[in-house]
Swiss-Prot record:
Maturation and modification: Glycosylated. Glycosylation is required for plasma membrane localization and for its cleavage by BACE2. Proteolytically processed in pancreatic beta cells by BACE2 leading to the generation and extracellular release of soluble CLTRN, and a corresponding cell-associated C-terminal fragment which is later cleaved by gamma-secretase. This shedding process inactivates CLTRN. Three cleavage sites have been identified for BACE2, two clustered sites after Phe-116 and Leu-118 and a more membrane proximal site at Phe-125; the preferred BACE2 cleavage site seems to be between Phe-125 and Leu-126, Phe-116 and Leu-118 act as alternative sites.
Subunit structure as annotated in this protein's UniProt entry: Monomer. Homodimer; dimerization prevents CLTRN cleavage by BACE2. Interacts with SLC6A18; this interaction regulates the trafficking of SLC6A18 to the cell membrane and its amino acid transporter activity. Interacts with SLC6A19; this interaction regulates the trafficking of SLC6A19 to the cell membrane and its amino acid transporter activity. Interacts with SNAPIN.
Glycosylated residues in this chain: N76, N93
Membrane topology of this protein: Single-pass type I membrane protein
Main subcellular location of this protein, as a coarse class: membrane
Keyword entries, A-Z: Cell membrane, Glycoprotein, Membrane, Phosphoprotein, Signal, Transmembrane, Transmembrane helix
Entry's Gene Ontology molecular function annotations: protein homodimerization activity; transporter activator activity
Gene that specifies this protein: Cltrn
Tissue expression summary: Kidney; collecting ducts. Pancreas; beta cells of islets.
Organism: Rattus norvegicus
Cytoplasmic topological intervals: 163-222
Transmembrane segments annotated in the record for this chain: 142-162
PROSITE patterns noted in UniProt: COLLECTRIN_LIKE
Cellular compartment(s): Cell membrane
Protein name: Collectrin
């Protein structure tokens, strides 16, 4: 009698959990690729943990608080660690809708990954989209960064203008080269007009050219 009951239960489970069955999901794990030398062996204990995590996730869904580990069925387990699973409703003897299972897995994906030391790439639910990490908030607000950049640009521009003004003032103080030398040369030039040597007019000292003085002016004492 017990053998007949066991055979009946096994047959029902096989009918509910099979590849590509309604509401069934395929899972693929890459334990060796993720953990390397620290990889663990996938055995019945790991299967039990997986079923427990799925049952835990389902209990978070409204009206599914009574989900037990025995309600999660695994089938077609391979050595490369892939398998199919379904979640059953024992009262109605059928599998729960795929939408409910998918929602529960997505809400608790990080908890499931952490239980096996894996992530979305090494613990794949092939029909369930990967969860996206929340966007990272910058530690410094964007407006402060923009303000800092603009402030630096304005500071550099002001510094360049100040330096340019200082250089221009120095150039104006020095004056054009060669002006003073030309004036000195003009002071030493003596011109000759009508055979009479004439000293050029000294604009700086106010001297008068003796060549243009009359005889009375020369003899008149100062």
């Amino acid at each position: 009698m017990l053998w007949a009951l066991f055979f009946l239960v096994t047959t029902i489970h096989a009918e509910l959990c099979r590849p590509d069955a309604e509401n069934a999901f395929k899972v693929r794990l890459s334990i060796k690729a993720a953990l390397g030398d620290k990889a663990y062996v996938w055995d019945t204990d790991e299967e039990y943990l997986f079923r427990a995590m799925v049952a835990f996730s389902m209990r978070k869904v409204p009206n599914r608080e009574g989900t037990e580990i025995s309600h999660v069925l695994l089938c077609n387990v391979t050595q490369r660690v892939s398998f199919w699973f379904v979640v059953t409703d024992p009262l109605k003897n059928h599998t729960l809708p795929a939408a409910e299972v998918q929602s529960a897995i997505r809400m608790n994906r990080n908890r499931i990954n952490s239980a096996f030391f894996l992530d979305d790439h090494t613990l794949e639910f092939l029909k369930i989209p990967s969860t996206l990490a929340p966007p990272m908030d910058p530690s410094v607000p964007v407006w402060i960064i923009v303000f800092g950049v603009i402030f630096c640009i304005v500071t550099v521009a002001i510094a360049l203008l100040v330096l340019s003004g200082i250089r221009q003032r120095r150039r104006n103080k020095k004056g054009p080269p060669g002006v003073e030398d030309a004036e000195d040369k003009c002071e030493n030039i003596i011109t000759i007009e009508n055979g009479i040597p004439c000293d050029p007019l000294d604009m700086k000292g106010g001297h008068i050219n003796d060549g243009f003085l009359t005889e009375d002016e020369r003899l008149t004492p100062l």
